[in-house]
Amino acid sequence: MARPIMIMGCSSDAGKSFVVTALCRHFANRGVHVAPFKAQNMSNNAAVTPDGAEIGRAQYLQALAARIAPQARMNPVLLKPSADTESQVIVMGQVDHAISAMPWLERQPRLWLIVREALYSLMRDYEQVVIEGGGSPAEINLRTSDIVNMRVARECQADVYLVADIDRGGAFAHLLGTWHCLEVEERALVKGFILNKFRGDRALLGNAMEWLYERTGIPTVALLPMVRHTLPEEDTLHHRAHPETQQINLALVVYPYASNLDEFDPLVHEPGVTVVPICGCERLDAYHAILLPGSKNTVASLRYLRQSGLAAEINRAVQRGVPILGICGGLQLLGREIHDPHRLESGDCPGLGLLDLTTTLVPDKTTRQRQVPWQGTRLGGYEIHHGQTQAGEGVQAYLPDGLGWCQDNVYGVYVHGLFENAPYRQQFLERLGWRGQTTGEWSAVVDASLEQVAQLIVESGWII
């Protein structure tokens, strides 16, 4: 196989995931059997592979870009923050309670063996592996515990490319400074610089790329423009307003440890629909519906809702008849009680009491893809949760098989990804008064964006 390609960034959110995704589709379009890899990801936005493994959403998308099935070995270690100093550790797609309980530095030797094995298995099975780094390789304080950046590059002798976000400013200083922080043998692996999110005329750069080359001997191989696309962000929500046609305002309550926010992207991109992240107490009078996303720590999220005053606002909205939809952790928040006998989070806690449900958190995690019967069709989605929920007499089934309940204008479901299904999205919005036609199945929208970003690689002139 060809030497692995590794994309590292000068900072978080420089564009590493974006470039890896574009490269995966670029290689796939050329007929190359390509696979993505990220040794360790930290995110509460997770996805479920066909065989029930849990990986980061970014690597899931990159696998789709490569036109292959997502696999656990593409993201062998996933850290899901559940408190300021705590993370659940997902190893090869499954929760590892023993490693989760270990101090950070004690974990790394064990995790490195797993990372190394996953990487080499991909290198054996694919013609090309495109690797994503984490954060920045210039974090000197993290060098001894590194299992995601230069240690990976040295292990497989990858061709490394450093990417910087030029839209933020300071890109050339970031590239030069990052390169200077690398060891001599690590600099030898760096084959090029990438400037991401460039706006305007290339002439505005003047001789900056030549200046950088004179000091490093490293060429700038690609200048990627700022583009609007529908690809999900790794840890945030797309926020796009449609002021001319605005009909529906949706409030998305973003509490601490909120997860899988990208599943609301299909709503964001519908004409006339605005999804507004609510990150502090504010009046919810102006919204047609309120959305409660998943949570990695439902008890902490409940505490936040009560302390911020949002719990009272949500209750007032329910009394006015505003529809409330909670997904996964959001469902659990809406119930009467959350029992935590194993102290997976923070102990027992009363819920908002808007659904007659009682949830018990258990060590075994449910992770699986689902096809849910719904009004003569099937809705694709996935489950990721520790909770087992018992329904009382006050609720009715909203989805079959214990996957969702409703009580008056309050709805709760365990299935993520429902809004990716055009029929469900259409009906949800129409019930709020929306008069439009959906953009269609979300998978087709995303695939069109994958083609769009892959074309940027071609147009950049990057020979790779």
Question: Language-model segments: which ranges?
Answer:
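Conserved P-loop NTPase catalytic core
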Residues: 344, 349-368
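Flexible phosphate-sensing "switch/lid" loops adjacent to ATP/NTP-binding sites
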Residues: 1-318, 323, 340, 363, ...
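Catalytic nucleophile serine of serine hydrolases
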Residues: 328-329
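A Zn2+-metalloprotease active-site environment signal
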Residues: 332
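Extracellular/periplasmic helix-exit of transmembrane alpha-helices
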Residues: 335, 339-342
